[in-house]
Regions:
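Glycoside hydrolase catalytic-domain context in secreted enzymes
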Residues: 17, 22-688, 694-711
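Bacterial N-terminal signal peptides
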Residues: 5-17
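Short beta-strand elements
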Residues: 712-721
């Protein structure tokens, strides 16, 4: 979605009702909708009774304000990995504000830590309140467009960087963590409102304005919709964005599932918005309606209540043509006001504790927020290879380190990033870690053989490579075929800088590769020939510090992969094949991956023992407790991610070869042993019966598996469903 699309959505035309004299403040507070003691729906009834039709139409934008009544709308801000009030896209361009920036969503996913994502959400939500309510800034919004609950079914997808991976349970669990952090823990009010995107199956960029993602209802309910359902029912989100694409031929912004599933079945009764310019695309690209009036009318009838588009004329024409009624508009804009009530925007300021977030130092400059950014980045780092315990480095045994590569002295920001208050590059982090005791040489490229010469003269070479999140090019343009972003899918999985890695490795066998990337690469040669490889995502302001902490052993990496890293493009089905049963993701992939889903190494070792189930069958609550003892058998503290998978043995329908249904990241001191308990829920084992239009829990033999990755099973046991 382009910046201009977002700006257009908030430029609402003046209507006659706004020309009336402003009501005095005392009169405003007398309105029943200002009384927090009244039921929410009664307060909304009062608002609707006071609005003119023109004012109601104005509430179909992203900032449903009614100045005549003193109602100030919510607005929208981006926030996938930190509040975006600046950055490469110049969000909030009239008053850009620095904010704490975390790793991209891909890196947040690799933490496998929903509690940590809750901390990320708290930081982001607090900074949103502060920026809006502090008189010095007085800017921003309280509806935050995050998380991205799309699934990374294909590593070629240009926006893989935004997602938490290919698995619905993992993505949903992490999304719930971020949502709860953004919205806060107050029983009455929200800190901010989390708006998930993009519903649904929106994982190709090329042609997304017109393509249809085709798959059956089972995959809708069992795969693609799972993170969104969890975000609503478990996380409490009451806002999401409909995607550009169609599902089985029906564009998502007018698809009946918006109303019939998310509203009627899940209880999503807040904001449902379009993507930028999507209203025009219904006519121009999808050719689904004869004109924009028809398109706007059907969108409202399906539940859309906020347009990121120039919508007012189409809505007005739809009303004139009787394609839409005032009651239709009343029905949907109730959701806008429900969200405003939860944000406390219609209540006295003293009633809402979040309204007091406006004093004190800028939060993005505090040690607390900096520490969260560093911890998240540390936890996101995945150790892919460590031959002969090459890492961690002992700086007392080193005299010279060569830091090489185009990403070594950069912290690159993506389109949805804000502006961090500072950044620490890999080079800067390494220099700060070793101080004056070790000589650091730096070469960006191998021009004039400089990188090779530096590597030959060093005790160890660290090569830092990866993608450019904006492709260092204009919109919809990526000169490097292996790179992608919004509007551009990747055409290759080959890392162009692997040639540099080869040159350095031949010059110095003691080479470490740091892959800073927004998605997987087919780095087969590197895996076979380089002794140590780590992966981390782009964008974190603490990238260099966290990386240095890992390389020199001050932090033991425990991140895990969230996608299957394939060896070649030939391992993948066609890009637009949305039926994952055709060999997609760890659930159905039939080949030998370069790195499997859930994989990640540590500087220590772990032993699993005493695997047991809570009983021979599920209890009356439909739950089964799965326990295993995990011991750190090494000499340093480390994190293990215990993963619970299931596979159906005799299902009457086609099922995945395995499915993640539980996980827990635990920190264990050297030699410490702990019992890890995971709860398997029968509700998560059902399949969607298309004939009966409901979930079914079938009688079956269920294999319960526990281990550190999808390809490494330590224990398994069959239980009867």
């Amino acid at each position: 979605m382009k910046v201009l699309s977002c700006l257009l959505a908030t430029l609402l035309a003046l209507v006659p009702g706004l020309l009336r004299a402003q009501a005095p403040a005392t009169a405003q507070t007398a309105y029943p909708f200002r009384n927090p003691q009244l039921p929410a729906e009664q307060r909304i009834d009062n608002i609707l009774s006071l609005l003119t039709l023109e004012e109601k139409v104005s509430c179909l934008g992203t900032n449903p304000s009614i100045p005549r009544l003193g109602i100030v709308g919510t607005g929208h801000s981006e926030g996938l990995h930190g509040l975006a009030l600046g950055g490469p896209a110049h969000w909030n361009r009239r008053h850009e504000v620095p904010t704490t920036q975390f790793p991209q969503g891909y890196g947040l996913g690799e933490t496998w830590d929903p509690d940590l994502l809750r901390q990320v959400g708290r930081v982001e939500g607090y900074e949103a309140r502060y920026a809006l309510q502090n008189p010095k800034y007085a800017t921003g919004s309280l509806v935050i467009r995050a998380p991205n609950a799309d699934l990374g079914r294909d590593p070629r997808w240009g926006r893989t960087e935004e997602c938490y991976g290919e698995d619905p349970f993992l993505t949903g669990t992490l999304a719930v963590g971020l949502i709860k952090g953004l919205q806060g823990d107050d029983p009455t009010y929200w800190q901010t409102a989390a708006l998930m995107k993009h519903f649904l199956a929106n994982s190709n960029e090329v042609g997304r304005e017109r393509t249809s993602s085709n798959f059956d209802e089972r995959l809708f309910h069992e795969y693609y919709a799972v993170p969104f359902r969890m975000g609503v029912t478990l996380g409490g989100s009451r806002a999401y964005m409909a995607s550009y694409n169609a599902w089985n031929g029906t564009p998502m912004m007018v698809n009946p599932v918006l109303r019939d599933v998310t509203v009627d079945k899940w209880g999503q009764n807040g904001i449902i918005c379009t993507d930028g310019g999507a209203l025009k695309l219904l006519v121009r690209e999808h050719h689904y309606y004869p004109d924009s009036a028809w398109a706007a009318a059907q969108a409202v009838k399906m539940g859309i209540n906020q347009f990121l588009d120039d919508y007012k004329i189409p809505i007005t024409n739809a009303l004139k043509a009787k394609l839409l009624t005032e009651l239709d508009i009343d029905r949907v804009i109730r959701g806008d006001f429900r969200v405003m009530l939860k944000l406390g925007l219609l209540d006295p300021p003293g009633a809402n504790k979040y309204a007091a977030i406006k004093d004190g130092p800028e939060p993005w400059l505090t040690d607390q927020h900096k520490a969260v950014a560093r911890l998240v980045t540390q936890k996101s780092i995945v150790l892919l290879k460590n031959e002969g315990s090459f890492l961690p480095l002992d700086k007392s045994k080193l005299k010279t380190i060569a830091v090489i590569g185009p990403r070594a002295d950069q912290v690159l920001l993506d389109w949805y990033s804000g502006t961090p208050p500072y950044v620490v590059s890999a080079l800067a982090g390494i220099k700060a870690k070793v101080g004056d005791s070790v000589k650091i040489t730096y070469e960006e490229t191998n021009q004039d053989n400089r990188a090779v010469n530096a590597a030959q003269a060093a005790d160890v070479a660290i090569v830092v490579v990866g993608n450019h999140p904006t492709c260092n090019a204009g919109w919809a343009n990526c000169p490097d075929a292996s790179e992608g972003k919004e509007a551009v899918d990747r055409k290759s999985l080959t890392l162009s800088d692997e040639a540099l890695i080869k040159q350095v490795r031949r010059a110095n066998p003691r080479t470490i590769v740091v892959l800073v990337s927004s998605f997987p690469y087919a780095i087969t040669w590197t895996q076979q020939n380089v002794p140590a490889i780590v992966h981390l995502a782009q964008n974190s302001q603490e990238l260099g510090n966290a990386l240095a902490d890992v390389l020199f052993g001050d932090y033991n990496p425990g991140g895990r992969l969230t996608q299957t890293w394939v060896r070649a493009l030939s391992d993948l089905p066609p890009m637009l094949d949305y039926d994952i049963r055709n060999g997609r993701t760890y659930q159905y992939f039939r080949g030998e991956p370069l790195y499997p889903f859930g994989f990640g190494l540590s500087y220590t070792t772990f032993r699993y023992s005493n695997f047991r189930l809570g009983g021979p069958k599920f209890n009356k609550a439909g739950e089964l407790l799965v326990s295993v003892d995990v011991q750190n058998t090494g000499d340093r503290t480390g994190d293990e991610v215990v993963q619970l998978y299931i596979s159906h043995q005799h299902s009457v329908v086609v099922r995945p070869q395995q499915e993640l249904k539980g996980f827990q990241r635990v920190t264990l001191k050297a030699q410490e042993k702990r019992t890890v308990q995971l709860t398997l829920r029968a509700a998560d084992l059902r399949y969607w019966d298309e004939g009966r239009q409901q979930f079914i829990l079938e009688k079956d033999d269920l294999n319960v598996l526990v281990g550190p990755s999808s390809r490494e099973v330590k224990f398994q046991q069959v239980v009867r469903l």
